[in-house]
């Protein structure tokens, strides 16, 4: 019986030893996401597979983990997006970006935020001063008065701009600040629980 358990243990140690060997080549190694891991070497970023093979060259100044098969990458202080083969489908042009979620990504030029689709088309105009990722079909956005509300995937305001801050929905609730207090709301804006901060 001991032989049966010994073989998997030897294989596991061998695999982890190989992984540790290639990770030492890099200053930083992120967790694997969508089959690829963001790595950094000599101030440049690229992506390796789980075996440590460089799939996307170390040519970026910064990078993000892959989400929904896409990753934000920065060149010369501008962000764009690549797919998991390294093909750039959004040229670096944005000052800030968030990862894709539900097929859309929040992007900024200067202080103006909007949303692009999976092809890089601007779907929701840059009418906001801040934004977060879509979740549950809604995204928190901030207007020019500094108030947060929620929009749907067509850019229609669903929950009015009334919050001092609004986070994305997680498990059907979102944390927002209203009248200086943290509360949790549902997608209809109903308070479901008082905040903890």
Residue map of PLM features:
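Residue-level detector of conserved, function-critical positions
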Residues: 20-197
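Bacterial Sec-dependent N-terminal signal peptides
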Residues: 1-21
